[in-house]
């Protein structure tokens, strides 16, 4: 069984390979080309942003130095602060606390997973 953090990294590799072979793609195209679900794409984007490998311009993602540090990095910082004080929380609770949508939460979790700052558990 693969742990979720490892899964995020594998999915990030899948997104990277897809962008490397196909060029710039929208989120919908990334989902179609990779076969990943939305949450998995968002976490992979966060992981790649932390690695400074992905950028988004006019709704298209491509491989390049990231321009997502402010957006994803700030959300990751907020989540890190909350988890440091509150302990274990689910994504719905985190979303309510920082007033961000699911896309933002999963991107930030991908960022934090790449930094090895969090442990994720899959719920049923």
State what each model feature region is:
Residues 30, 42, 58-60, 94, ...:
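Short loop/turn and capping residues at structural boundaries
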Residues 1-14, 55-80, 107:
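Short alpha-helical segments that sit at the start of domains
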Residues 36-47, 100-111:
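Short amphipathic alpha-helical interaction segments
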Residues 97-98, 121:
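Long, charge-rich, low-complexity alpha-helical segments
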Residues 49-59, 113-124:
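A short, conserved structural fragment
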Residues 27, 39, 56-57, 91, ...:
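A local structural micro-motif
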Residues 7-33, 72-97:
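Short amphipathic alpha-helical interface segments
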């Amino acid at each position: 069984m693969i742990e979720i953090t490892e899964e995020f990294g594998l999915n990030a590799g899948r997104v990277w390979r897809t962008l490397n072979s196909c060029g710039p793609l929208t989120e919908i195209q990334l989902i179609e080309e990779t076969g990943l679900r939305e949450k998995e794409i968002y976490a992979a984007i966060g992981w790649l942003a932390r690695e400074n490998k992905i950028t988004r311009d006019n709704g298209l993602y491509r491989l390049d130095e990231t321009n997502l540090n402010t957006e994803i990095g700030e959300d990751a910082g907020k989540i890190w602060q909350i988890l440091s004080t509150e302990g274990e929380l689910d994504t719905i609770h985190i979303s309510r606390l920082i007033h961000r949508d699911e896309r933002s939460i999963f991107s930030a979790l991908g960022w934090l997973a790449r930094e090895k700052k969090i442990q994720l558990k899959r719920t049923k």
